Design a protein with these regions (language model features):
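Membrane-interface loop-to-helix entry segments
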Residues: 93-105
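Membrane-anchoring alpha-helices and their flanking helix-loop junctions
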Residues: 1-88, 105-166
Length: 166
């Protein structure tokens, strides 16, 4: 198991060095969080870590159900951001960082599905990295788009989708 984790760390560091050199740390956090999400999934499957802290079927079902809104957020974000400009329509009028939120929800779902120590550790780190990436990307977007992004930040929550669904 430790060999797999060491190989994963080497790969992630190799992928992140060019990003850090560009001085866009939020991209490094985003890639790190997404990488840890996939690492958690693959390592739990490959090392058969499922259920080492419990095997509660209704939690597992909830985890699988959570993949649906996660996928919707991620796909909606991909469709929205292809424009390249400041997008304030579609999913982006409900939440500022739907791709990060979707990946974080999927990472949380992995905890429920696998119910293992490995999934908890990797997914919690992934969620923290994605949160930091969204905060840093806000700073970057304020520099890029100025007052229009500040107004967008005031109106649209970073991750709280329920704020707009009142």
């Amino acid at each position: 198991m430790w060999i797999c984790i060491a190989i994963l760390v080497v790969i992630l560091v190799g992928l992140l060095i060019p990003v850090v050199k560009e001085r866009r740390a939020w991209i490094a956090y985003a890639h790190g969080g997404t990488g840890l999400f996939f690492a958690s999934m693959l390592l739990n499957i490959g090392l058969q870590q499922k259920g080492d802290i419990g095997d509660i079927i209704w939690l597992e079902i909830m985890g699988f159900v959570l993949f649906v809104p996660a996928a919707i957020l991620i796909v909606s974000a991909i469709v929205a951001i292809v424009q390249g400009n400041l997008v304030k329509t579609g999913i982006m009028r409900i939440v500022r960082h739907p791709m990060y939120l979707g990946t974080a929800i999927a990472a949380f779902a992995l905890i429920l599905v696998f119910q293992s120590k490995l999934s908890i550790v990797l997914s919690v780190i992934a969620i923290a990295l994605l949160w930091m990436a969204s905060k840093m990307e806000d700073d970057y977007n304020v520099e890029r788009f100025g007052d229009s992004y500040r107004e967008y930040m005031r109106l649209v929550p970073r991750w709280n989708v329920f704020k707009e669904l009142k």
